[in-house]
Curated annotation (Swiss-Prot):
Keywords, in A-Z order: Glycosyltransferase, Golgi apparatus, Lipid metabolism, Membrane, Sphingolipid metabolism, Transferase, Transmembrane, Transmembrane helix
Protein name as catalogued: Ceramide glucosyltransferase
Enzyme Commission number(s) of this protein: 2.4.1.80
Cytoplasmic side: 37-427, 473-501
Lineage, top ranks: Eukaryota, Fungi, Dikarya, Ascomycota, Saccharomycotina
UniProt membrane topology term: Multi-pass membrane protein
Pathway: Lipid metabolism; sphingolipid metabolism
Amino acid sequence: MVQEELSLFRITTGYFFLLWYIIILVAAYSGFFEILFNFRNRPILHTKQQANHQNDPESDDEEIYEGVTIIRPIKGIDPELTSCLESSFCQNYPRSKLQILFCVDDPNDPSIPIIQKLIAKYPTVDAQILTSESYNSQTKTSDDHYGPNPKVNNLAKGFVHAKYDILWVMDSNVWASSNILKNSVISLNGNLNMSRKMGQSRPVKLVHHVPLALSINNTTRSDDFIGGQDLEITAMTPVPSSESLNSQLVKRKSSPKSNNSLNVHPGFTYSKFSKKLGAELDEMFLHTSHSKFYVSLNNLAVAPCVNGKSNIYRRSDLDQSVRLIPHKDSPFFKDPKVKQDAGYYTSLGVGHAIKFFARYIGEDNMIGIALWENTQGRTGLTGDVVVQPYSGSENNAVKDYIQRRVRWLRVRKYMVLLATLIEPTTESIICGIYGTYAISTVFFGTWFNKYWFVMHMLIWMLTDYVQYHTLINHTLDVKNITYLPNWLNESIPPKQRNCLQWGYIWILRELLALPIWIIAMIGHEIDWRGRPFRIKKDLTAEEM
C-alpha cells in the first residue's frame, strides 16, 4: 500500500538524497573525530634525530632544522597586533635559523613603531622591516604593484629578500603558539599530515594550520602596547612544563575579568551587544562548520583546500610551479596572457614567482592549485591552529560578518564553482531537510518525519558544541608553549557563555548561512578593504 503511493520520482530522489546525506555526514564526522582526538592538546612533533639526542636538544636543533623566513604583510593596526607579531619571535626554533620580514607598503604606517619595539626587544633575532619603493601617500600606490591583490603586492619584496628557501607566510592579525614552526618544518620535510606519513605519489608541499577567530574583550591601541610591556618584564622567566623538559611557559599578568561578555549586566546595551555579535558569529563559524570540513577536505586530499592565514612552503617549489604553467594545460591557468606572465615573472629570478599571483584575489587558493598541479604536491596539517582576535570595538556587527562571508563566497564562486554550489548542503538545516526527506521516503514511506529532523538538528548541535569547546580548550592550553598573550585566558567571552548563550549564537549562525549564500551567488562585486573588485572569467581580479 505504501509502496504504491510512492512515485518513481519520489523513490529516485529519496535514494539520491540519502546517498548525498551519507556522504556529507561521513565528511562532517571524519573532520569532527579528527578534531576531537587530535586537536585536544597542542601537538609536539619530534624528528628521529631528536629522539636519539635528547641530552643536548639545542645543539641538535641547530643541526637538524633548516632555516626559515617568516614573512608577515602588515597594513594598519589590527586588534592585539603586538602579541600577534610577537608570536613570530617566540617560536621554539633555533634563532640562528630564523629570519622575520615585516612587509609594509606605507613607510608611515602606524604599525611601524610597534614592529620597531619588537625588533629592539629581540636583538638576537634577524628581523627587519621592508617598505615599498616610491610610495605615494596621496594615491596610496607604489612601484610594488603587480596586480589588484594588495597583499601579494606587499608580500613580493619579502619573497625576494628572504634568505631561506622555506617560507612561513602569516597574516599580521593572527597569533601562533610557539611550537607551530617546528611542527610544520618536521611535517614538510617528513611528508606528514596530522603526524601521519603520506605516500610519495603526492607528497606534502604546503603545510597550513586551522584558522580560528576569537571574540575577546575590548582593547585599545594603548592596551596593545601595554600587553607587550607586560611580557617584556616576564618573558625572560620561563617555567618548565610538566609535560616536557624542553618546553617552557611564559609567566604573565592575569587579565581582569571582562564585563563585555554576553552575560547581561547593569552596563549592558543593545548597541554593545550587536556590535560584538558579528565577531561571535565569525568565531562560531570557524570553530564549527568551517573547521570540521576544512580538516576533512585536507585529509581527503582530492583537491587543495587552503586558507591563507598561515602557510608554509618552499620558495623553490612555488617558483617551479609557476615556471611550468606555460608548458601545461590547466583549466585554472589556460589564458595566453596568464601563461605569458607566468613565464615572465619566473625569468626575473628566485622569489619573483609570487608576483604572478597578484592578479588573483584568492591568491591562497591559486598557490595551492599551482603546487598541487605542477609539483604533484598536497597540503598537510600539523594539528595546530592560528587565532585571529576580534574585539567588539568596530567592524564586528552582524552586517560586517555578513559582508565578510559574502565577499569570500563570491571569490570562491569563481575559483571553485562546484564546491561553492554544493556548500549549502553541508549546513545543518539544509542537510537536515533533504536528509529527513530521504530517510522518510526510503524507510517510512512519508514525506517528512519531523522527529528525525529534530533528532538530526540536536545531534548536529551537540557535535558542534563539543567541537567548539575542544578547539577553545586547545587554544587556551598552556602546556608546552613559551608565549601566551594576556587576551588568551579563562576570562575570554567564549569561556563565560552558558549553554543558552552559546545556542543563541549557533542558531543565528545556522539561520544566516543560506541567505548569505544566496546574496553571494546573485552578486558579482567584491568589496575588499573599501575597494571594489570584480572577478573575470579567467579567475583574475579587476579593480573597478
